[in-house]
Amino acid sequence: MDIVFEKVEHVYNARSPLARRALYDVNVAIRSGAYVAVVGHTGSGKSTLLQHLNGLLQPTSGAVKIGEETITSHKRPKQLKPLRKKVGVVFQFPEHQLFEETVEKDICFGPLNFGVPEDEAKRKARELIKLVGLSEDVLAKSPFDLSGGQMRRVAIAGVLALEPEVLVLDEPTAGLDPRGRKEMMEMFYRLHREKQLTTVLVTHSMEDAARYADEIIVMHEGTVWGHGTPEEMFRDADKLAAIGLSVPETVKLKQQLEKRFGVVIPSPCLTLEQTAEAIQQLFSKVSVHD
């Protein structure tokens, strides 16, 4: 499902003394099936941009086109209901979205709300609980008796239960330890491929953006500063530093090695695996002297 922002502006508390412009002149397209990371310094407009993707916020001016749906300032909330089925949002702490007596009821809530028969909703719950890495035994339990990591997976299953075509992730690994973070990101990447989703990841982690995204959108002061592949966006560390961002540690190492040995390393070095291979090739060609 293609996503297009056309001259989007968003002003909080418009037409009041407290008016604050959060987005202006945002023009960007996300192709169907892409995995796109949105990065930017705190206050850059990332989260405001995200909330336009399923109509939680509507543009003050301009339009957001998501598939055949168009969101403008004139849309009524009821008109956005079909869109919210197509666009699933996983917030920073998705476990805070849990509220039902059992895990099964929580996962079934969304589908039942959209008219899915109860037996079909329960079948989906059984399928999804396994998809997010939990056993069916969990379905009968209270979500509040689970560990934090398990609760997060249950909440994600609830989002997936509506079978969204677009999955929006707002810092979904916040508060997790490194191992939990990696497991969660790998799960999202697997879901992206298996379900053929359009995935939009809002993140502060340049490493996650480099490793998983096909494209990166860089936000700065409420507008799109840059948009391209990870290799393109991380090519100029100084420009990113000027807007308060850094490149991944692997890219820093690559640039230091190029400067030290006066060579060009063809690999983008976006992941540890790419970097290890590039270093091995470099030292097989370069003689190192004290």
Curated annotation (Swiss-Prot):
Pfam families: ABC_tran
Subcellular location(s) of the protein: Cell membrane
Protein family membership: Belongs to the ABC transporter superfamily. Energy-coupling factor EcfA family.
Listed name of the protein: Energy-coupling factor transporter ATP-binding protein EcfA2
GO cellular component, one term: ATP-binding cassette (ABC) transporter complex
Enzyme's top EC category: translocase
Highest rank taxon of the organism: Bacteria
Entry's EC annotation: 7.-.-.-
Membrane topology according to the record: Peripheral membrane protein
Sequence positions that bind ATP: G40, H41, T42, G43, S44, G45, K46, S47
InterPro entries, per the entry: AAA+_ATPase, ABC_transporter-like_ATP-bd, ABC_transporter-like_CS, ABC_transpr_CbiO/EcfA_su, ECF_ABC_transporter_ATP-bd, EcfA2, P-loop_NTPase
